[in-house]
């Protein structure tokens, strides 16, 4: 009889030990409350080389974190402003908060979203992309940039968050053609753009250097046959109308090489492989 009672007792002891071990394993993943603040290393925003006829690459105004001082960081239903401390080379940054930061509650990954710029009046909502109509000044060009990292997993042992651009970057490289020996002094604008969210339907570009002009736009599609690039030079106004729709996607860079002729514009090449065949001679608008 004693022998029969001993077996269930031993079994019960084994179950108790197993349960205790499982609880300890579960507790081992938890962290003391308020002791491990969430500090994140932010990456992304680098400028990549864009050889002629190559696929589009991620757009970046400066290719670094210079000028970004804080971001809105969302974790769960809460949104807090986090300070941005850029690295020495500005290629990455540390996101931190001194007062009332988020805290790790376990070693499990967390899901966060972050964005810049944000609306101080309502930091809880990511603002719609709305760029400047006149980007001919560097500050207005730079201030038209929007970045974010949406619903990304962040690991406890490697808390890294990669940001991307919410805008598309369009670069126009002018070359003198028949009837012109120089394109210096040209004014370049993007046309036929979407007015969604209060965006401008035309954007005056920034003369980045020499004969290179740039602008940031909201993601959109410019319809085929519509004037897309306008060049004002030597008292004449010239337009480029693509044969196919021009799809401008967030985070992409589109570089067009445009030759200015007395009879119109010729698209010499484009860094977007799927759009390289849209080149055609154009005539000035009547």
Regions found by a protein language model. Name each.
Residues 2-8, 17-279:
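Sec-type signal peptide cleavage vicinity
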Residues 278-286:
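A short, hydrophobic C-terminal helix/tail in secreted or cell-surface proteins
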């Amino acid at each position: 009889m004693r022998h029969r009672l001993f077996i269930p007792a031993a079994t019960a002891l084994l179950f108790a030990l197993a349960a205790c071990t499982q609880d300890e394993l579960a507790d081992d993943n938890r962290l003391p409350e308020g002791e491990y603040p969430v500090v994140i290393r932010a990456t992304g925003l680098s400028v990549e080389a864009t050889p002629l006829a190559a696929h589009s690459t991620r757009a970046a105004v400066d290719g670094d974190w210079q000028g970004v001082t804080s971001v809105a960081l969302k974790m769960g239903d809460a949104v807090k402003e986090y300070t941005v401390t850029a690295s020495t080379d500005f290629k990455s940054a540390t996101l931190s908060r001194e007062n009332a930061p988020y805290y790790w509650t376990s070693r499990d990954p967390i899901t966060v979203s972050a964005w810049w710029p944000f609306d101080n009046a309502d930091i809880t909502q990511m603002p719609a992309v709305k760029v400047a109509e006149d980007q001919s000044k560097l500050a207005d060009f730079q201030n038209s940039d929007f970045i974010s990292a949406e619903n990304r997993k962040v690991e406890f042992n490697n808390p890294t968050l990669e940001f991307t651009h919410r805008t598309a970057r369009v670069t126009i490289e002018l070359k003198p053609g028949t009837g012109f020996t120089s394109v210096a002094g040209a004014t370049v604008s993007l046309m036929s753009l979407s007015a969604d969210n209060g965006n401008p339907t035309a954007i005056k570009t920034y003369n980045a250097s020499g004969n290179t002009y740039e602008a940031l736009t909201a993601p959109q599609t410019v319809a085929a046959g519509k004037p897309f690039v306008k060049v004002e030079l030597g008292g004449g106004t010239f337009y480029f109308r693509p044969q196919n729709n021009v799809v401008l996607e967030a985070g992409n860079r589109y570089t067009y090489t445009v030759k200015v002729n007395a009879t119109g514009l010729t698209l010499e090449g484009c860094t977007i492989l799927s759009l390289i065949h849209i080149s055609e001679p154009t005539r000035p608008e009547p």
